Every structure is written in structure tokens, then in C-alpha cells.
């Protein structure tokens, strides 16, 4: 030890104060000889010093000689080769090769008790080879090499039932991750998939996935206290490692999607290798196909974590649609129109395979999530149809005409009626077994959860269409109740009633469907019907009496106001007569409320308008109709009173 310290101290002091490049040859020879002497000394010391360990008798190791020689020697060597290209990297590689060869030579004599020294030399050899990588390559390639080396070390530890190589492999994975993300930037390359960003990310992702695959089941170890502690940590790693590797795999494709092409001329800006649409679909396709491959892996190995990415197909497609909207594109633009059906088909396949994967891969929480994905998929399809219709209206330049709103309401009506007809066939649980997937297990997700928000939107859309549309749908002439505006609104009301009847007939009835039997539903339908019939008269006044289509002109029009008074009274009369004959007291009261509204309008609106003759006509017409109502439709008795009367 005294010679070791003295030699190092003298060599270091001389190198610091007196060394110059012309001394390289003699200094290099001295350093090689010095290292060889003390390596031999460490081997001779181990040979001469037996030591009893847990696995038997081995030779002791002088840690100062074994570890001090290469560490201090490499420090001096790095100073000697500093002027040379990659001198430190080649020196580290030489140190690593030397110690690996020594370990291999001593391994044949492990039966003689050199096992401890072999492990020390192996650790030094692997360490120097690992160190050579960052000294020679940039950070992205360094991280890739470290990740591969870490996977190799983990595999060796798995085969040898030793925890230390496995721990070393995990540490290298962590270092690779830090090195890669610490220098991450937008790649510049003329070659697709052949640049450090993509290749580096792939070479980090694949080792992480391999380690996750090996560690998914408990691995053997020596049983020592340290090994048991490491085993508890290792048992927590497979799922996070898999997710980390899968995300890195997607990161590789993300780096490819943002790749820049080198500028053809100096000082000119670089251009994107992929258009925005192409980059979006590259990422979407890579994500869905990778998820499908992971699902196949999960089905083959029965590893539940590998199936997780395949259950996120719907969020991926939603993000793709949002990204498409963000750049102002539609589903009908470019190659998006064939890509969307393929992506939806793959998403459907993923749903089907997941739901039939077995209880060991699909727990109840994931099952509920997949059930809601059916609802979300229906909403996504509605959004895609709406986007395509928007593109069509834009292409036909129909904005500003009634056609735009008519197309929207008619399309929503068709979707609601289609889902009612298709999914409503399986509205009885007892009969679902004869239907194919997905109706046999998810019919309610389509005919109730998916359609209920659409029904509300359709009601609002029909209300807005009836309220705002002038009915001008050139080149078609305006015919009351037979024009596109009125027909679209009436069909919407019919579809809502059809859907309500199907839901009410369901067994068991969906949760929350009781609202469709409450007065609030009929109140909403009645309000929509009143608005529809009232605005029909507005459009008649506009088209046949030349009343301008604006709020001021319509409000101050004698034709509109008198027509409203008579129309609402007739509607109230019809409602009250029908309610009287059927004994529907709430409906009769609704008609009476409408009559009260007519009277209020006569007082507040008609009396304030000019023209005594106009007011007289309105009052006489309404008064006569009220007399008819009082004669033909008196208030029905309450339900209890009617029952007592019938019993008597």
C-alpha cells in the first residue's frame, strides 16, 4: 500500500507540474507498467489470503488495490490522452476490455476461490465500458447504449438468480432516461425514422419493455437480506416500467412527426417533414397500432398491464379530432376520410378483444370504463358526422340560408331515429342474447346514454330552427307545413316521441328514464309544438303578406298579432275539448293557461297598437272562441271525484 500511494502521489505531482506532450511515450509506458504491476499485486494478494464467506472459502480482496488502481490510473490516463480525438473514450474502452478479459481468465479458476475477485473485475469492466459511451457519443446515443446495456445486465441477473446485476440494469435505465430527456430537441434529418431522436427513443423503449416483461413474475435471488429488500422493490416495477417503455415508444413516433428537413441553403428556414394532417395521422396510427400490438402481447402472456393502452383508443381518437379542428381541417379533407373509418374499425376491434379477454385481464373497473366507451364512441361518431356536414354546408356556401339549420336538425333527427331503431331492438334484457355484439351487452349505452344528450340537443335545435328560420330554402317554394323548415321540426318532434316510446318500453328501464314519464317532458314537447305552430304563422305572414322578417316588423304587424290571438285561441280550444273528452284535467288547465296568455296579449300588445278596427276584430274573434270553449269543454272533475261518480 505504501508503494501504491507513493507511486501515485509522485506520478500525479510530476504530471501536474512537469508533463508536456513530448513526454507522452515514456509516460504512457510507465503508466501501463504501473497499472499492470498493481493489478498483479491485487491478484497475488487474493491468492495468498483465504477468506470464509457465506458460500464457502474464497480469496480476500484488497479494495484499495483492486479499485484504486483503475480509478486513479484512468484519471492519469485521461490527462495523457486529452489532446487526442476520443482519447478518453478509447482509454475507458481499453480499461473495460482489460478487466473483462481478466475476469474471464479468473472465472475458469473460480473453483479455486477467486469468485469475489471475478465479481470485482466484472463490475470494473462493465463500468468502464459504460463510461466509454458518453465519452465517445452524444447524449441521445449514450442513453440508447446505456439502456441496452442495462437490459443485458438485467437479463444476466435473471439467468444467474442474482439481484445486483438486475439492480445495475435498472440504474442504467434511469441514467438513460435522464440523459435522453435532458438533451431532447426537435430532430433535423432528411431521412424518416433514421435520426438519433427516433432511433434513440426506440432503443430506450425496447429495453424498458423487455425488462418489464422479464420482471412481471417474481424472479429468483440469493435469499439474502439485501436480495429480499430488492425483490420487494422489483415487484413494484413491471407496470411502471411497461408504461414508461410504451410512452417512450410513442415519444419516438412523436419525434418523427415533428422532424424538420435540413435547409437547402444556408440561412434559409427549415421546413417540416410532415404536414399537420400527416403528422396527426402518423401519431394516431402509431398509437392505435402499438396499442393493438400491446393487447396481443397481453393476451399471449396474460399480463393485464399490457392491455391498458388498448383501452384508451377513444381518448386518442377524440384528441385526433380536436387536433384536426385546431388546424381548421375537416374529416373529409385529404386522406382523413379513409383514415377515420379505418381508425374507428381498429378501435372497435380493440373494444371487442378487450371485452372478451377474460376476467384475469379485465377487472370490473375497466369493464365499466369500456361500457362507457361505447357511449363515447357513439358521441364521437355524431361529432364526425356533424363535422362532415359542416364541411358540406361550407362547400355548398349555404351559410346564411335556412338550409344550413335544416340540414343540422334533419341530420340529428336521422341519427336519433337510427339509433332508436338499431339499438332499441335490444331494449329488453331477456331478448338481448339473440343479438350480436355490442347490442347483446351494451344496448343501453347506445339507446339511452348516447341518445339522451342528443335528444336534448335536437329539442334545442328544433326550437332554434323554428324560432329563427324564415323558411327561405331556394329554389324550393314556401308551402306552409310542407317546406324543409317545418318538415325538419315536425320530424324532430316525431323522432323524440318515437325514442320516448322505445325507452319507456325497455325492461328494465334505464336509470333516469323516469323523467320521460313526468309532466316536464310533455311540457317541453307542448312548448315546442306551440313554438312550431306559432312560427309557421310568422313565416306565412312573411311569405304571403310581405311582412319583413325582423323582430320589429313582426311585432308591430296587425296580421301577425291578430293571427296569433286567433291561432292560440283555436289551439286552446282544441286542447281543452280533447282534455274534457278524455278527462285530462292538467291538459285542460294548460289550455286555460294558453287562453289567459291570449287575454294578456290582447291587453298588453293589441290595445297598444294603432287601429281601432283591428283591435275590434281581434277581440270579437277571441271572445267568440272563448264562448265555444265554455260551452264545449268545461273543466273536467278531479280524478278522485270522477271515480266516486262512476262508482255511484
Segments the model singles out, each with a brief description of its role:
Residues 1-121, 128-524, 528, 534-565, ...:
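Extended, compositionally biased regions that are outside compact catalytic cores
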Residues 567-572:
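Hydrophobic alpha-helical transmembrane segments
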Residues 456-458, 590-601:
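Hydrophobic alpha-helical membrane segments
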Residues 586:
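Short histidine
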Residues 644-648:
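Cytoplasmic C-terminal tails of single-pass
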